[in-house]
């Protein structure tokens, strides 16, 4: 009898404690969205938005991920929601995207409250296709975080221009009587922000006079889309040879890096199979040999944890479906009589083709741009120029190397940097890659989405493992030129092909 009372009172006290914690978390959040029902049947989810605010949402215990996502989209009044997702960390510190078809409690094990973050899931290959001003604003906030955290590197000149666009969008036109060079030091744009960069940003800001916040954000996105690592979802893996590699998921295909050197690009139409088992990911690629016959190449990668392997596989399936297909693959209505092994995961959202074709911008939308976090000012030792904007040149405040290329300003992150190459339906040469961001003479996107071939560097691919890089042959340039000419005639200008490409996924 005593044990019964202890269990009963213990459960009651636990429920009261959970209810107090839920109310406390709801009070901390800037916005609280309640749900009908008693505390026993409610869970609390706390979502951090891109502008730094928090939203606390109460949902039924058996609520699925799509219900929480819909609540956040309704709160933001966001129509182009397919570019975004809710992200959370598991107990193994592996990041996951919330699956809308599954229960929240079965996915997010740490809680309640269950903490998630709103993030850009698919970076638009062409930001001009984003119809809503609110969508472009959220993209800018995400890119600002990527650059500040070091995830997305950019050269000095590009960083100065992007920061100046941020100032123009947030503060408006430069005013001589109100704004001083020290103002820039109150903001944070890059991991290592020097006084020299702040003066360059201040001078560049003067040149953007007259731009509205919407225009400045559009110019920001059109500049940021040419960064080499824009929209690349990186995953660290190990190959059979024991070396570390990185796989980057892009709208075009899967990039392969060895250290900071890009050694290959598997285009989605050339990938015939992509599956996983425990912590092993298998990638099968079809490529034409010298005689024009198709040959299969199998690559096996290993990850540190089975959950990380499944997460990489799911991200690859979603990237392929979103950027390559006209619509998601429909699930078969009949069930097989046999036991089915493997994951049943399928991408169920809209594709980029559907998003750009169906979404229409509203006539009038209103939202509030929240100010950036401010820091204490620094006393600048260098003086900014007081000349007119048309007489200013950012290059006066930028140090250059002896060969005329721009110095890299930031500490290199763990992510590799790929050189920018001119887009077009031909193979791109991958040799003599620059070690510093911004040292390339080109300022273009890395790969055109219309290219439907497998790109390789000067190294010979091994069907079992990725071998260490070997010195390029002296006739390598002629070899690449011949294959470029050959592949020029087999490309097709199809931007959104059908359900071909990936099988057995």
Swiss-Prot record:
One of its GO terms (molecular function) is cytoskeletal protein binding. One of its GO terms (biological process) is actomyosin structure organization. Keywords: Cell junction, Cell membrane, Cytoplasm, Membrane, Phosphoprotein. Residues 394-406 have a biased composition (Polar residues). GO terms for cellular component: adherens junction; cytoplasm; cytoskeleton; photoreceptor inner segment; plasma membrane. InterPro entries: Band_41_domain, Ez/rad/moesin-like, FA, FERM/acyl-CoA-bd_prot_sf, FERM_2, FERM_central, FERM_CS, FERM_domain. The modification Phosphoserine is found at residue 39. Gene3D superfamilies: 1.20.80.10, Phosphatidylinositol 3-kinase Catalytic Subunit, Chain A, domain 1, Pleckstrin-homology domain (PH domain)/Phosphotyrosine-binding domain (PTB). Residues 29-119 are annotated as: Required for interaction with CRB1. Residues 357-406 are annotated as: Disordered. Pfam families: FA (PF08736), FERM_C (PF09380), FERM_M (PF00373), FERM_N (PF09379). It is a peripheral membrane protein. It is found in: Cytoplasm; Cell junction, Adherens junction; Cell membrane; Photoreceptor inner segment. It comes from the Eukaryota. Residues 43-327 form the FERM domain. Its main location: cytoplasm. Plays a role in the formation and organization of tight junctions during the establishment of polarity in epithelial cells. Component of a complex composed of PALS1, CRB1 and EPB41L5. Within the complex, interacts (via FERM domain) with PALS1 (via HOOK domain) and with CRB1 (via intracellular domain). Interacts with CRB2 (via intracellular domain). Interacts with CRB3 (via intracellular domain). This is Band 4.1-like protein 5.
């Amino acid at each position: 009898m005593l044990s019964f009372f202890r269990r009963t009172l213990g459960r009651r006290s636990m429920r009261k404690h959970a209810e107090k914690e839920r109310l406390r978390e709801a009070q901390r959040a800037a916005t609280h969205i309640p749900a009908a029902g008693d505390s026993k049947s409610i869970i609390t989810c706390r979502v951090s938005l891109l502008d730094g605010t928090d939203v606390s949402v109460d949902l039924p215990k058996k609520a699925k991920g799509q219900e929480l996502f819909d609540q956040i989209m309704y709160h933001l009044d966001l129509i182009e929601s397919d570019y975004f997702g809710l992200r959370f960390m598991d107990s193994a510190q592996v990041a996951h995207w919330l699956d809308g078809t599954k229960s929240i409690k079965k996915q997010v094990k740490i809680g309640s409250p269950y903490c998630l973050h709103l993030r850009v899931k698919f970076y638009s290959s062409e930001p001009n296709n984003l119809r809503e001003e609110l969508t472009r604003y959220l993209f800018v906030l995400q890119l600002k975080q990527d650059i500040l955290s070091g995830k997305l590197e950019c050269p000095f000149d590009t960083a100065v221009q992007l920061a100046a666009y941020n100032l123009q969008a947030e503060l408006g036109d430069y005013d001589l009587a109100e704004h001083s060079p020290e103002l820039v030091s109150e903001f944070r744009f890059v991991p290592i922000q020097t006084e020299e960069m702040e003066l360059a940003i201040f001078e560049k800001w003067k040149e953007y006079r007259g731009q509205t916040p919407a225009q400045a954000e559009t110019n920001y996105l059109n500049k940021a889309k040419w960064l080499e690592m824009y929209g690349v979802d990186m995953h660290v893996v190990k190959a059979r040879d024991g070396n570390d590699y990185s796989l980057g998921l892009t709208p075009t295909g899967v990039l392969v890096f060895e250290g900071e050197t890009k050694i290959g690009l598997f285009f989605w139409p050339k990938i015939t199979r992509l599956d996983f088992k425990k912590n092993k990911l298998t990638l099968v690629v079809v490529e034409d040999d010298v005689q024009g016959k198709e040959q299969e190449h199998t690559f096996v990668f290993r990850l540190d944890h089975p959950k990380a392997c499944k997460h990489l596989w799911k991200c690859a399936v979603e990237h392929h479906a979103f950027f390559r297909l006209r619509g998601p693959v429909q699930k078969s209505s009949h069930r097989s009589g046999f036991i089915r092994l493997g994951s049943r995961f399928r991408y169920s959202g809209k594709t980029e083709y559907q998003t750009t074709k169906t979404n229409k911008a509203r006539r009038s939308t209103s939202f509030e741009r929240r100010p950036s976090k401010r820091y204490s000012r620094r006393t600048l030792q260098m003086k900014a120029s007081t000349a007119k904007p048309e007489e200013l040149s950012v290059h006066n405040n930028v140090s250059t190397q002896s060969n005329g290329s721009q110095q890299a300003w930031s500490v290199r992150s763990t992510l590799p940097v790929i050189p920018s190459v001119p887009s077009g339906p031909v193979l791109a040469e991958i040799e003599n890659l620059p070690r510093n961001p911004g040292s390339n003479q080109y300022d273009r996107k890395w790969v055109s989405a219309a290219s439907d071939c497998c790109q390789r560097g000067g190294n010979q691919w091994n069907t079992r493992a990725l071998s260490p890089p070997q010195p390029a042959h002296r006739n390598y340039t002629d070899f690449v030129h011949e294959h470029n000419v050959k592949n020029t005639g087999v490309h097709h200008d199809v931007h959104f092909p059908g359900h071909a490409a990936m099988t057995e996924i």
